[in-house]
Amino acid sequence: MRPLSFAYLNFVLILSLILSACGFELRNYANSLDNQTISLDANNSFLNLEMENQLNLKGYLNPSYDSQSTISIKILNHVVNRYVGSAGPGATTTQVRLDYKILYSLKINGARETQHTFEDISYIDFNQSDLLAFEREEEITKEDFIRKAIRNLEFVISANLNEIK
């Protein structure tokens, strides 16, 4: 073993020991919604069904508690708009901009209903010959939009719950 690699190994070992000793850990999203029951009111669009599916996977929705739910979410508008632009010689390279927007009303513990909006933008580059790959990429991007919207929703609900306390 060379002296340089031994010194590097010692450095990494000491650094990891220091970081673990001071309580450092990777980002962990708050689970302040674990003991809350959430009801979701939305139409049967693809985006709303995907959001409902992701909320179910996190364990936030429980259909048996609909009448007793402490948090009520009503999705008013949920859209992804697609804008296409071409650049380059012969316009062979195309870039698509996906604009995501969700408008929802939130009611916590029977308090006043408030409206919230979350917006996000993503750009996808693709070649005309890779149309199937682009469609899959667009689907993945929509799922990512919904994950970000749920994180934002968790933040808004947690902030409102802290204000109520």
Located regions from the model:
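Surface-exposed short loop/turn segments
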Residues: 72-117, 123-139, 151
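Bacterial N-terminal signal peptides that target proteins for export
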Residues: 1-11
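C-terminal motif of bacterial Sec signal peptides marking the signal peptidase cleavage site
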Residues: 18-21
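N-terminal segment of the mature soluble domain
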Residues: 30-79
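Bacterial signal peptide processing site
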Residues: 23-25
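C-terminal/domain-edge helix-coil "capping" segments
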Residues: 132-165
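Sec/Tat-exported extracytoplasmic proteins
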Residues: 55, 59, 106-110, 153-161
